[in-house]
Amino acid sequence: VDALAAAVHTLLEDPDASTEVEVPTPEEAARAVRLLDLGLRSGRGVHRKMAKNALHGAKTLSTDRLQVLSEFVQNSDDAGAGQLRILLRSDDILVAHDGAGLRLADVLPLGMPWLSGKTADAEATGRFGIGLSTLRALTTVWEVHCHPFHVRFSGTHLEPAAPPELPDGISGPAWTVFRIPLSPGTLTAVQLLEWFEDWNDASLLLLRHLRSLEVTAGEHSTVLTLSWEDVTQRRILIDGVQRDAKVQHARTTDGALWRVYTAQVAPHADWERSHKALGSTVPVGIALPLECGTNGSVHAGLPVAPLDVAARVHTQFDPVASREGFASSRLNTQLVPVIADLWAAGVRDVLERVDHTAWHLIPLPSPPGSTPANLLQDRIRTELLTRARQSLASELALPVAEGGPDAPLADFAVEEAALSEVLDDSDITRLGKAPYALPAAVRDSGGRWRKVLADWRAAGAADLRTEVQVVDALNLLSDDEWQNVARLVRLTAVALEAGHEYVLVGRACLVTADGRRLRPQPAENAFADASGEATGPLDVLGVVLDLHPAYAEHNAWAKTITAWLRRRDCLVRRDDTAAVRSSYGLGPRAKTMRS
């Protein structure tokens, strides 16, 4: 019995069939390739025509002419490769990975459109069997080399190929090498490198195996890679069940750090993947950037769609065949809350244990008037925003001080932004009637914490306290123990900018050089205008009072107050004799000043 011929016949009848035949030598592999090609040529004409037309259609399957390179990345990860190398040469491009080698059963799915050897493999990303057919955007002929197989594909036909001379870095039995001949001008080094600019190290974050991707074109070479560190394990409530989640740190070549959470969940009875097997568990993963300014994305292994949240999320979402978006499938909708569970737990973990100022991880509402499309990434963003307002807002606990105990957000008072440089923690705590003031150590420098809390407050989340307002802080002007003149100056200036002039005119909000607090009433007090002479001919009368030196400082606070006092005719130049006499002639006020 010719075992090899029998195995080929079996695969031609059922490409998913299991064959255990060994192909030990290049000669046997070449014979198998010829038998496969003969079987395809002997097939019914209608089937050959369908395959040929499918290949023609694959040329325009994606709007990205180099989509096939993304497919190579996906296939390499499915093969368990740790490295993928892409090398553009003068007349071809080589794509090589160090994953599992080529088997007889792999040959037909590599070359035939809509034929996949991964449909029954729940863990593999591939499913449609069309990805490598997008090669037709570059060429109609290509080769694969992996001992003992050396195969050339041309349309729907295949034949043995001569082993090529390969660079040392990708030669040897450990490597599977795809060779893609290119006509002159088909792909330049500039075009390849420009395409690759859309990728970065973080593109590899949620792959299962691939850790390094190198692209070389001419004298230019770029490497994407991540260095990984196992951090810990956490028990996280996902989909209503406590699950073990692995926590790792991944660092990019430019030093950016990501905190990655991965777990496995049990599928529901009604979960069904499109054209793909469903395993006994479903992987879920999120990657959170520990630095702000990083864009997010939705992955199905590789990034597929942008996500307007500082997170990369992954599970077994159903993509469309071109992998340029996601299908409108029931499963995709069912997986959104599962991802949100892991995301909420991860963000809380970062804020509580890693970086108390990582507010950039929390989404904010879209600008008014924007209408998000009903795409998967939009539904994910909406779910994460809702989850943040609900569970995260109520469950998050932050330290009350450095080294101090944690407290829920409802126990913290915060001041409105205008008061940030005016009040200290004791003022905020007292005015906000709260156990604690939100400490500086949990406030990010960009102020996103304030926007997040404002959104949560507006959503009625977690009974957050209202901000201490400027009008509340004006009560401190009547507090004899509030003696810090610099802060009193700031509070007065802030109150003016907030439109509370009518309140200030009745308050002792000004401090003289000798420490008295007086009201800004021209009928009661005249204050020396520091812009005039330091002395005047009528100083002996004592009717013009010197303000505290804090009002003469060159800052916005002092300038706001002195400008206001001028408008109210409360400032008098010492060398303006007429004005001083007028002040002296104000009867009861002058007598009070002289006494």
Regions found by a protein language model. Name each.
Residues 81, 139-141, 209-213, 220, ...:
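A broad structural signal for short, well-ordered beta-strand segments within beta-sheet-rich domains
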Residues 1-20, 182, 223, 228-233, ...:
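Amphipathic alpha-helical coiled-coil/helical-bundle segments that mediate oligomerization/assembly
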Residues 144-147, 151-153, 213-215, 352-357:
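Acidic/polar loop patches that form or flank catalytic/metal-binding clefts of enzymes
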Residues 159-250, 333:
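ATP-binding catalytic core of ATPases
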Residues 65, 103, 128, 137, ...:
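Active-site-proximal structural scaffolding
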Residues 82, 91, 174-176, 209-211, ...:
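Residues at beta-strand starts and edge strands
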Residues 1-190:
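GHKL (Bergerat-fold) ATPase N-terminal catalytic module, capturing the glycine-rich phosphate-binding loop
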